[in-house]
Amino acid sequence: MKHAKQTRAPWILLACLAAIALCIVAAVTLLQPNTNPKNIEIPGTRGNIPATIQLPAKSARGEELPLVVLCHGFTGNRQGDGHFAPMAEDLVTHGIATVRLDFAGCGDSTEPYANYTLANMAADVDSVIGYMQATYGTGKTALVGHSMGGRLASLYPQLGQYPVTALALWSPANGTGLQGLEFLSIDNFAAVEELAARADAEGSVAAWGVELSAAYIDGMRDSDPNAALQERGLPVLLTYSGNERILSDTTQTETKAAVESLPDGQVVLEPFVNGDHNYTSEDPATNTQLDADLRQVTVDFLTSHLQ
């Protein structure tokens, strides 16, 4: 009997060592800094939505997994002029998940651009938030929107079905009504009004190499994003560059005033005086600094309200 016990002892020791090794492997896995971005298709109301998600490592998550939805601008895509991917990397280190999507007719979307409307964009944001909640248990949610994506983000608390905690607006096209389309002909607003009239009469109109539907024009005409911001009173970060060009001084002034009137509104301009509407520059060093500053300001704002 003593001999049998001696035979089993080494196996018991090996089993214990193996269990310890598995625990170490599991711990190391949890301590990985973040997961890689993953391209997926999210079911939407009109078909699948091309999207990229990025989740923090489990060790970086709190009890609730915050979410940021990144919304690109007119004729843009989910790369966000090169800013979205690195910002998603920044956010996961703070335990915040992200999803960035291509709206109708943009990026990898197979829909016609005629489906690009404010209502459809809000529905797509509904779909991705719902998917992230159901699949990953996300909680507090913020939106980041650039240009037309900023207008959408401003309006989403009115148009969407999910509550949001905060909004970050990069150079939003927030002119009232059709003024939000001023970028189509910044020096001649009468031309914008003419395009809108043609869309109303013909069902759509070509501009900037895409087909704009009457539904898109109607949504723009009927919306007032700055009034929506003031009505909801959410925490809002607003940035504009020093060389917007396609957004009028009036739009910028009115939007700044709207955000500054909010209890927790923040306007940041100085770091971006040398940038264009997309927060880029032909000078490589300036371009790099613009991206770094835009991400830093935005991440600081988001973490302060989501954690």
Cite the ranges covered by each PLM segment.
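N-terminal cap/lid segment of alpha/beta-hydrolase-fold proteins
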Residues: 28-61
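The serine-hydrolase catalytic nucleophile loop
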Residues: 76-88, 103, 250-251
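Glycine-rich nucleophile elbow surrounding the catalytic serine of serine-hydrolase chemistry
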Residues: 145-155
